[in-house]
Amino acid sequence: MAEERHFILGAAGHVDHGKTALITALTGTHTDRLKEERERGISIELGFAELDLGGGVRLGVVDMPGHEKFVKQMVSGAGGVDLAFLVVAADESVMPQTVEHLEILDSLGTSGGIVVMTKIDMVDEDFLGVATEETRELVEGTFLEGKPIIPVSAHTGEGLDVLREALLQEALSLPARREEGAFRLPVDRVFTLPGAGVVVTGTCWSGAVKDGDRLVVQPSGDKVRVRE
């Protein structure tokens, strides 16, 4: 049996370009959990899902808010990703937060990634071609230059299998995550689930953790035990 490899995938792009719908189509998990997010149809906080690509590769997916008001949350989620997909809606092409998110990911040293052209069911071939060319010009000189631009529709499912395969190949090209060293996880969110207790989410920067491990929460110094 092949050894499992785990990576963190960040989903970036302009507001309402279909990041959350795409993640839901890929994973079956709707990452908008807040009532306000569902009512407004936009992501406000970081969302999380898991994607099993097969071949021993699993991705922890971070859905990063695309609205300009929530760029702080986006930066928080982008800090520990191994690879990213930049989502561009075919019916709108490149928009301000498309550019901003790309610049943030590039400045953070993100190495792996692909571009996803969403909502292709809403445009004709000519419009799709223009949006694709504008996106290709945008990523020149960044970590996404020369990376695949995958056209998909979360609504019809078109292109999702191609996207999964592209993500798998991109992940396999990356070095395995280092699990040595102290476990460090900057906490993005804390909430309580009935029957489970306190749940924290974030992006692991180093080390590994398992059920029963004891950790120290900083800066308070509180000692906690990990439960699955």
Whereabouts are the PLM-identified features?
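Solvent-exposed alpha-helical segments within well-ordered globular domains of core cellular machineries
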Residues: 24, 72, 76, 86, ...
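Conserved Switch II/interswitch segment of TRAFAC-class P-loop GTPases
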Residues: 57-59, 64-69, 79-130
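Conserved G1/Walker A P-loop phosphate-binding module
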Residues: 1-64
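Conserved catalytic-core segments of large NTP-driven translation/proteostasis enzymes
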Residues: 137-228
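Amphipathic alpha-helical transducer elements in NTP-driven molecular machines
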Residues: 4-5, 44-45, 68-71, 78, ...
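Signal for well-folded cores of large energy- and translation-related assemblies
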Residues: 27, 31, 35, 39, ...
